């Protein structure tokens, strides 16, 4: 039988200041012999020398081991308050429960004996007469949240209350109100600090738990569960609120968790760990961590609000196949601060709550391959070096379904690795220099932008560095301000698909690709306005731009720029270009290819296509209208092939040019219809009446021009009252085809038509008063030592009240040869009157020329 209970001895020791109570009982053996185990051990064996430690009794070895354990060497840290129950037992079916009992302090037994301190020699001290009524002992409170109440026979650890029972082997059994059990094997009292350290096991003996002088709980063994219902505060380096060493460990943090000074709130080492953090979590200071798990297949559920500042880390998981579910709002501020961190492959973070990152912090960091982030909340990132989501590893997938706002140099999503995918379904707003919405560094990166993208202030919406990148932009994209870029890719074989509406203004750039073999497919509506604004830009060889949507360019902007050799631009949509300096499509590089089967409208000093290339190919098969002071196509270079198969190339503006070709050895084939007819109803028609507009200009040497289509020129004559020795009025100057230079060849196989008009201006009084005489309008003008071969049909019709200089003019040694199949038809000429000078009798005009 037990002559003294462990509980009584512990209480006696606690009252007397004894440092350690471990198996302090007198046990009667089977032979009736009493075993005296009343051994006095040093309170702090850590201060003893190695020789002194060797001389200690064997009963003190648990104390020595206990003092050497890491969980007892943490120093004087702040106390943990209000942790709930630690479940250290299994049920009858050996199913692990989700709630639990906790490590306790020595409890009382059923005895009515008053605890009596042992004598130095092991003799007993006889208690007082039992007739005396003893005074009930007061509860003993320790500074690390442990209370021993002998009267109520309870042990309270943190906020968990247990009843206790002594066992025959000297251990103490604990049981909470739900019937869950645990066992205490050892305990130690620190008299100076009034704290108690406890050590025990689960009911089945499989799990070891320790509650140290700092109020820190350490679980060693599999299938352990800790329920922390109260607020937990951890402060100081190496301080830990709850620690589990073993597989399938679980911590349920219902109370708030506050960690600072380099401490750890929850530490679990082992596979398949789970933390349900339902309270508010606050972590601050370098090396501080709210939750740390080292092991595979970990799951952390942060349901409450988390605030991470000044270099702290909210959740860190080191292991493969980890999952972090952040349902609450996460706020991260300060350099080196991190909300959620996973180091391992197949990591996953589900961010249902909002994510707010500033001051250089990181919201989510994953290092490892095949990571996934589902960000369903609103993400706000601001300040340089701040990153909302960062993944370092291959095959990463980031899904941003909520709205993202990135400002002042921050980055929303950054992925460093190959084969990455970012799906941005929500709206993304990026503002400020060095701000980036989504950034990928690696090959085969892909961004699917289903949501709207709004970029300003020099920010970048999407940045990809690496080969074979793809961006599918299906939402609305708005980019404004200098240096702002909606989509930028640095690498070869890039593909960008702009399917939604894009608006680029004030010096911004919609899409920019720097690399070879790039392709940009623009099937949506694109509007570009303002000097230095660019819709799509490729800098690299073999770049391709396909325009299937509509493109509107104004204010000096450029719709498309393709800079590099062997570049291609194919337009099947509508292009509208207006204002000084505006260019619809600019291509510069050797061997360029341009094709247009869409409709192009150019006006107000703009240029539709600006092409600088040698050995290039230009094919215009759609329709084109050229307005005031504008040029439809401006081609500069040698050995180029130009095919004008346009169903309608109309030059209707003042001082306008349909096609301008400058260079040597170019080939121009006109198979479509070309009309030059200045708009006489325009407000500025009279002002620019004498400034010629031209259908096609060819400047240079050894060029070959062939007309197989139809070329029509309309010329107006403004007539006034006849006066002696003065012209009857004035006629405008317009030309269909002008070829200037030596060695050029012009083959006129198609039809030429010159149509005259009379008094087409709304008010031609100012023009007619100048009395310039007959028109110098000609369908064909060739100047220089070149040859013209006329084989087609030529028609003259309409009104020519002042006469005209000729349908074809060849000058400066130009040669005209009229083939046997050529015809000339004069029809529908209502008037051919002239006064004051003699006009030509034939509708051909030669100046220093030869005709055969």
Curated annotation (Swiss-Prot):
Residues 339-348, 517-526 have a biased composition (Polar residues). Residues 307-319, 506-516 have a biased composition (Low complexity). It is found in: Secreted. Keywords: Secreted, Signal. Residues 1-21 form the signal peptide. One of its GO terms (cellular component) is extracellular region. It comes from the Bacteria. Missing up to 1200 C-terminal residues compared to orthologs. The gene coding for this protein is interrupted by a hybrid IS2D/IS30C element between amino acids 839 and 840. The full-length protein (which is about 2000 amino acids long) is part of the autotransporter family. This is Exported protein YdbA. It comes from Escherichia coli (strain K12).
